[in-house]
Amino acid sequence: MKKLIMVLAATVICGASLFTSCKKDEDNDLKLEEKIIGKWMVTDMNGKPLPSNEKTVYTFVSATKATVSTSINTHPEVGTHWNDRLDADVTIDDNKITLTDHPDETTTVVEEYIVTDISGTEFTANHKVVVTKDGIVVDNDNHVLRLVKVTADYSTAILGKWECQELTGIETFNDANARLEFFADGTYNYWRKNDAGEWEAVTNREFQNYFVDGTLLATRWKNTGEDELREWWEIASIANGQMQWTALRQNADGTTAQQGMKWVKVN
């Protein structure tokens, strides 16, 4: 009888070990270390499309390193951040990806992605983010996110001077009377046509910055004596001297509206 009990116990232990091994193999079947490499943009949260100003681009250069690009000034609890390819540490454990970065000297951001599905073009995950400032948690959120792989990077193609040809949808800070020149150092110049039909540079700004990561374009500027302003766009295409932008905007009542701009390259 004692021998039978020992055999049964051994069977249970082996069975449990086999189940654990199978479960681990199932997680490893995701092959996150391989599939995650590349550039990804967050496009949906909890089943709804994200406005352009809420989007983030992650570039996984390896299974241990990534960069994060995002422009944040609409969430007072986490402060204002301008993250142009901010370095992040990455750990991957089965189907969990953890990113840790430091937007400034006092802030730490830890993101956990529990990946539920991944392909060569997109992945979905249960996402948790914890933001601490001076060791105090200032933000702790959980969402279901969808990320899409970004194959284009317009950070070089956007360089040069562009003239707006058309603006569709709602107007925010821009109208069709605009020329922009983007420089490799992350600054840009802005011109407007005066009443005489001549282009004049806008000179009342303390700074004008931008970054492009993949298809995400973020700008920020500050007029003398005024608050800093920001805007977000997604570059739909740049080809043959033509450039198209698109953006999903969210109104105060929660409704959304699409906006677009078309540009042509000029000398």
Predicted regions and their residues:
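Extended, hydrophobic interaction surfaces within ordered domains
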Residues: A16, K55, I92-D94, T98-L147
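Tryptophan-anchored aromatic micro-motifs
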Residues: L32-L50, T151-F173, Q208-N209
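Fold-core signature of tandem repeat domains
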Residues: I36, W40-V42, Y58-F60, I97, ...
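Beta-turn initiation residues at beta-strand->coil junctions
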Residues: V42-G47, V68-T74, L99-D104, N126-V131, ...
